[in-house]
Amino acid sequence: MDSPPKLTGETLIVHHIPLVHCQVPDRQCCGGAGGGGGSTRPNPFCPPELGITQPDQDLGQADSLLFSSLHSTPGGTARSIDSTKSRSRDGRGPGAPKRHNPFLLQEGVGEPGLGDLYDDSIGDSATQQSFHLHGTGQPNFHLSSFQLPPSGPRVGRPWGTTRSRAGVVEGQEQEPVMTLDTQQCGTSHCCRPELEAETMELDECGGPGGSGSGGGASDTSGFSFDQEWKLSSDESPRNPGCSGSGDQHCRCSSTSSQSEAADQSMGYVSDSSCNSSDGVLVTFSTLYNKMHGTPRANLNSAPQSCSDSSFCSHSDPGAFYLDLQPSPFESKMSYESHHPESGGREGGYGCPHASSPELDANCNSYRPHCEPCPAVADLTACFQSQARLVVATQNYYKLVTCDLSSQSSPSPAGSSITSCSEEHTKISPPPGPGPDPGPSQPSEYYLFQKPEVQPEEQEAVSSSTQAAAAVGPTVLEGQVYTNTSPPNLSTGRQRSRSYDRSLQRSPPVRLGSLERMLSCPVRLSEGPAAMAGPGSPPRRVTSFAELAKGRKKTGGSGSPPLRVSVGDSSQEFSPIQEAQQDRGAPLDEGTCCSHSLPPMPLGPGMDLLGPDPSPPWSTQVCQGPHSSEMPPAGLRATGQGPLAQLMDPGPALPGSPANSHTQRDARARADGGGTESRPVLRYSKEQRPTTLPIQPFVFQHHFPKQLAKARALHSLSQLYSLSGCSRTQQPAPLAAPAAQVSVPAPSGEPQASTPRATGRGARKAGSEPETSRPSPLGSYSPIRSVGPFGPSTDSSASTSCSPPPEQPTATESLPPWSHSCPSAVRPATSQQPQKEDQKILTLTEYRLHGTGSLPPLGSWRSGLSRAESLARGGGEGSMATRPSNANHLSPQALKWREYRRKNPLGPPGLSGSLDRRSQEARLARRNPIFEFPGSLSAASHLNCRLNGQAVKPLPLTCPDFQDPFSLTEKPPAEFCLSPDGSSEAISIDLLQKKGLVKAVNIAVDLIVAHFGTSRDPGVKAKLGNSSVSPNVGHLVLKYLCPAVRAVLEDGLKAFVLDVIIGQRKNMPWSVVEASTQLGPSTKVLHGLYNKVSQFPELTSHTMRFNAFILGLLNIRSLEFWFNHLYNHEDIIQTHYQPWGFLSAAHTVCPGLFEELLLLLQPLALLPFSLDLLFQHRLLQSGQQQRQHKELLRVSQDLLLSAHSTLQLARARGQEGPGDVDRAAQGERVKGVGASEGGEEEEEEEETEEVAEAAGGSGRARWARGGQAGWWYQLMQSSQVYIDGSIEGSRFPRGSSNSSSEKKKGAGGGGPPQAPPPREGVVEGAEACPASEEALGRERGWPFWMGSPPDSVLAELRRSREREGPAASPAENEEGASEPSPGGIKWGHLFGSRKAQREARPTNRLPSDWLSLDKSMFQLVAQTVGSRREPEPKESLQEPHSPALPSSPPCEVQALCHHLATGPGQLSFHKGDILRVLGRAGGDWLRCSRGPDSGLVPLAYVTLTPTPSPTPGSSQN
C-alpha cells in the first residue's frame, strides 16, 4: 500500500485513467509470465497473467515480462507497432492515444497513463506513451502471443472455453500459454498488439472464451490478435479460443482496451476526472500527477500496475483504479485473474478487447492498452470508457467524492478500487488461500499489497499474482496503480474506480466500469481468486475494500457512493459493460463478456491464475465447463454469457463465474452483498449518497450514443440508483464470492462448479441461468451484467435476459460479453438502442437500461439497491424508488441484501456461481417472480416515475435475462422495505395514462363549451339543468362519466378481498363506495353515495356510478372526490394495480393526476342541476318512445291500409313521389333529424312529435303527405339504417323504401331487391341488419341514448339534406307499405289487416325477405299498380309478396361503398345505381353495374325509384 498512502483519495479518481497501461503490465505480467516464462504458461487458456501455475514465479514472470514486454520484449515492440496498428484501428494512430489521460502529465503521448504506468513500472521513458505497454513491449501481448499458439489450436470456442477456465487452467495451462506466448511473442507479438488489444476487447466483450479461456484464448489472440479480432467478429468460437492465454493476458489490457477503447472513443473523457467535473478533473489531475510521479513508480510495477490496470481497465480507459494496495502480486494476480479473463476474452475476440477494455474493476478499460494493441486496447478502453463514462461520468463525481474522501490516502485508486475494494475488502477479510480469496476478494483486493501471499490466498489469482509478483512484485508493490490510460479515450482522463463503479452503476449495463473498478481490485486479486471470485477481490480488499469499509464505517461520505457507484458501476457495468457496449460490434463475441466480466473473470482469473488448486476447479469452472466441455465459443457463449451476464469477466466463463462472483462478491461485500459485506454495513455507505451530490451531474459524454445511453441516468438519484443497483447486482456476485470465500475450497469447487455452472451451467444455465439465477452474488451481478447487458446489448434492453439459455449460441450471436457486458461492449449495436431505450425510459434507463440490457435489471436493480448496494436486499427495491432508502438500509434491507447475496438474481450458471450449490439452492429458494418484483418494482416504480413509459416492458425486457430475472429482481416480501418495494415490476404506459386525462379534458371542454354559450347566470343555470337543457346531461353521460370511469377503471383489480366472501368483483362503484365511507371530510360524499345507492331505478353499478358523478357535479365536488381518493392510498392499494392511473399518480405520473385535478376544477364553477336519474329517465323515455312508435305504426297501418296501395301507386307513378316526398320529407326530415339529431331526449321529443303528428293526426298527416308519418315511423323503426336508407329510401316504385339499405328487404323496390314483405318495417325493415333494425325498433332512439353514433348522425344529416326531398316521398310511400310493424307491413300496403301483420313473423331473416322470385315481385308490383285487391291479398298472404311493387326497372342504389370480398361479388360505390338481375339467395342480390355483374349484399342497397323525379337525390 505504499502507493495508496501517496494517492489516498486523489489516486482513486486518477485511476479512472485507462487501465490500459496497468492492464498491459498485468497482461504483460501474464505475458511475461506466459511469454517470459513462456514455458511456464503454455496453457492455452491460461493467460500467463491469469493462468499462472506458479503464483510467485508466474507473477514475477508476468511482471517482468510485462515490463519487458512493455519496454523491450520483441512482443513489446510488436505490440508497440501493433499498438499503433490497434490504435489506428481504433481510429487512433500510434500518435493518437486511445485515451490520453489529461491527468497523465507524463510524456506518455496520447496515452500517458499507460506509458506512465509502464514508465513508472519499467522506468522506461520509451514506454512513456500511455500505450507504451502496448507499444514498448506488451508482455500482455506477449502473453497473448505466447498463448496464441494454444489459441490457434483452441482458437475460437476452445479458447473461449479455456478462457472461461483461465483461472483454473492458468496454472495448468500457464506453461502452454507461456510457451504459446513465447511462440507468439515473435510471430504474434507483432500482430498481437492490435490483436491482443482487440482480443482483449473481444474477450472482455466475449464472455466465456475471453475470460474463461484467458490462457488459451489470449494465447491465440496473442498469436493472431488481428486474426482473432477478425475472428472475434467473424468467428466467435475462435475468438474465445484465442482468448485462452492471451485473453487473460489481454484481459487486463483487453478489459482496459475494451473499456478503454469504448471509453476512449465514447466517453473516456467522462470516465476520467476530465468529464467528471472541474474539481474532479483537478483531483484526477492531481491524483494522476501524484501518481505519475510516485504512481510512476507504481506504474513501474507493471505487473501490479497491470493488475490494477486490469481492474481499472474494466472501469474505464481513463479510469485507472489506483490500487493502492502495495501488493504488486495481488494487483498482478488480480490483474491476471482479470487478465486471464481479459486474455480469454481477448483471445476470444482477438482485437475486440482492444476496442473495449476489460471491465476489470478499473483495469478493465486499460488492459487493451497494456495488452494486445495500443490502438485496439485504446479503442476498447475508449469504447468501454465511453460507455462507462456515461455511467462513470454520472457516477464519476460520486466516485470521486467517495474515492477522494473515503479512499484513505493508502489507496486513492482504492477509491475507485475501494468501491471495488470496499466490496473486496468486505470480501477481503477472508482472502482465503485459493477459492477463498475469491470470496475474500478484498484480501485479494490490494493490488499493491501482497503479491505472493495474495497469490496463495487466491489460488487462481496466485498464478496471476505469481506472474505479477515475478514480473514486478517489487515494482508493483508500493506502486499505486495509476492506471492512467493515455487519452485513448476521447477524454483520456483518469477515472477512479469509484467513479467507474459509479459509472457502471448509472448505466448498469456497463459492467465495464464496475468491472473495471472491481476488476482492478478484483482482477488483481482475482487471478487466483478469479476461481473463487471473491478471492481475487479480497486481495484488493485489503487496500480498497477495507478502505471502503472504513470509509463506510467512518461515514463513507466519499466511499459509500464510491463503492456504490464504483462497485456497481465498475463491476457491473462501467468497465466491461461500457467497453462492451461501446465495443458492441467488435466485442460481439466473448470479448464483451470478458470485458464486462473482468471482475467475474477474476473468478476465472483465479481459476486460470490460481495455483494448481485453483486451476483444478478453475479448470473445472473455466476449463471443464468452458474450455473442455463446451466449445470455446459455445462454452464461452454459455459460460461467458452467463458469466458475462453475471460479470463482464464472464469471458472466462468458468473463471468468469468465479470472477463474476469474486467481483460480485467484492462488490457484494462492498455493497454489503458479500458475506463480509454483510458484516460491513456496506449498504449504509452505499445507501449513503456520499457522491450523490455529485451524481446529479449527468454527463453527456461524447462517447457514441451507446455510451450516452448507457449513462443516460439523468438525475443524481437515478445515477445513485444505478450505482446502487450495479452494486446491488454486484453484491450478488460478490456475495457469491463471499460465500465462496466462506467456502474457499468448496468455493473453489463450487466455483469450479460455478464456472462449470457458468460454463456448463451457462450452457445449461444458458437456459436456466437467466430464469434461475441461483448464485446470489455471482448470479446477481452477472445477470445484471450479462443478462441485461447481453440482452440489452443484444436487444438493447430487450429481455435478452434469456441469453444465458441461448448463451452458447448467443455468445456468437450475442457474444458472452453481450450478456455480461453486452451493453458496454456492444455499445455500438446495443448501447445505442439502449440509449434510445433509456431515453424512452429515463428511470427505466437507469433502472433497467442503465447501460444496456443489464442495466434494466442491473442498473435498475442498481436503482433498487443503488443506495442499497449494501442493503441491496431490503432496500433494493425500495432503494430503486427512493434514493433515501438507498442511503439508509433498514434491518430489512440488510436482510434482503443478505438474502440476495445468497439468492442472487442472476442466472444460476450465469452468476459467478462461486457456489454452484448455493446458486442452485438459491435458485430453488428464490422465487423469481417473488423476488424480482420488489427490486424491480422499486426500480420500476422509480423508472415509471422517471420515465413513465412502458416501464414494465423494460423491467421485463431489460431485466438481465428474462422475466425470471425481473421476477427474481424483486426481494422477497419480507425484505421489502415498503409496499412499493414488494410490488412487482410495473409497466406504466404514460401515453395511455395521458389518454385517460385527455378524455376527461375533452369531456370538460365540451361541458364548459355548453355553458359558454351564454354569460347570463340565469341562462347558465338553465344550461346546467338537465331537465331544461338535457344536452348537459347528455354531455356528462356521454363524455364525462365514461372518461372518469375510465380513469377509475385503469389498473382496477379484478377482485378485492372481502372478509365475508373472500373476494368480490371490483368495479368503479366499489371504489366510490370505499372512498365515500363516512368520515369528517366525506359527509357530503357519503350522503351522495347513500342517496344514489337508495335509488331503486338505478339498477346497475354503471348507472349508479354515473348518477354519482352527476351528483358530484351538482355539489361541485368532483375534483374534491378525486383528490380525496388520491389521498387515500390504502383505498388505491386495495383496489388498484401498481400500474393503475391512481396508483401511478403516486409514483410515476403524479403530474398527470395534478393535470386531471386542474381539468376538473372548472366543473366546480359551473351551475349543475342534474337529475341523478337522468340516465334512467333517458332509458325510460326511450322505451316509451319505442312503445309509442309501435302504437303509431299500428294505428297508421290501420289508417293507411286502405290508402296504402293507392298512395303507393300514386306516389310511385303519378304524383312522382315528389309531393309525397316533400310532404313526407318535412316530416321525415324532422323525424330523421330528431333521430339523427342525435340526442336522446331531443330525438325522443322529436320522435314523439313526429309520431304524434303522424299518428295523432293520421289523416292530417296524410294530407301533408300521408306517408310522411309512415316514413317517419319507418325511419325510427330502422333508425340505424336511416342514414343509409335516407339516401336509398326513396323508392318511388317499390315505395318500400326500406329506409335503410338494411331495410332494403323491406324496400325491395326492385323486384330483385324486393325485400321480403316487410313484416314490420320496424322489425324486419333491415334485410341484413334485422337485428339492428329490431334493436332500433325496440329501443328506438333511446337505444342510441338519444343519438346515433356521431358518424351515423353526420351521415344522416348529410343524406337527409341531400336526399331529404327525394327520399321523403319514396319513403312515405314505403312508409305506407312498410310501416306496418308486423310482417303485415306489406299487407298493410295492400290493405292487409293489423292481425295479419301481427301474424307475420316480426324478425324475418333477410334470406326470407326475398323468398319471392323476381316474377313474383313483378306480379305483386302489377297487382299493386292495378290496385287489384286479390293481389294485395296475395301479397298479404305472402309476406314476401310485399316486395315493393317495384317498377319493372328493378334498380337499387348502393347505400355505401363496397369492395367485393369474395368471388362473384360486385364492387360498387355509394350512390351507384345497380340493376337487379335477380335474387341470389340469402341476403344477396345479383346485380349489374355497367358491364360488371355480381352479388350485392341486400343490406348495402336500397330500392331506387327509377321514375322518381328525385332519383338523383335518392341516388345520393
Swiss-Prot record:
- Residues covered by the RUN domain: 1031-1175
Composition skew (Low complexity), residue ranges: 405-420, 729-746, 791-801
Query: Pfam families under this entry?
Result: RUN, SH3_2
**What does the UniProt entry list as the effect of changing Q1161A?**
Decreased interaction with RAB35
**Classification via PROSITE patterns:** RUN, SH3
Q: Where is the composition biased (Gly residues)?
A: 206-217
| A GO cellular-component term linked to this record | extracellular exosome
* Outcome, altering R1015K: Strong decrease in interaction with RAB35
Localization (cell):
Cytoplasm, Cytosol; Cell membrane
Tissue specificity here reads: Widely expressed, with highest levels in brain and testis.
Q: Which disease is it linked to?
A: Intellectual developmental disorder, autosomal recessive 61: A disorder characterized by significantly below average general intellectual functioning associated with impairments in adaptive behavior and manifested during the developmental period. MRT61 patients manifest delayed psychomotor development, moderate to severe intellectual disability, and variable dysmorphic facial features. Refractory seizures and brain abnormalities are present in severely affected patients.
Under the subunit heading, UniProt states: Associated component of the adapter-like complex 4 (AP-4). Interacts with active RAB1A and RAB1B, and with GOLGA2. Interacts (via RUN domain) with RAB35 (GTP-bound form); the interaction recruits RUSC2 to the plasma membrane.
Q: Which PANTHER family does UniProt cross-reference here? A: AP-4 COMPLEX ACCESSORY SUBUNIT RUSC2, RUN AND SH3 DOMAIN CONTAINING
- What is the recorded name of this protein? AP-4 complex accessory subunit RUSC2
Instruction: Say which species the protein is native to.
Output: Homo sapiens
The gene for this chain is RUSC2
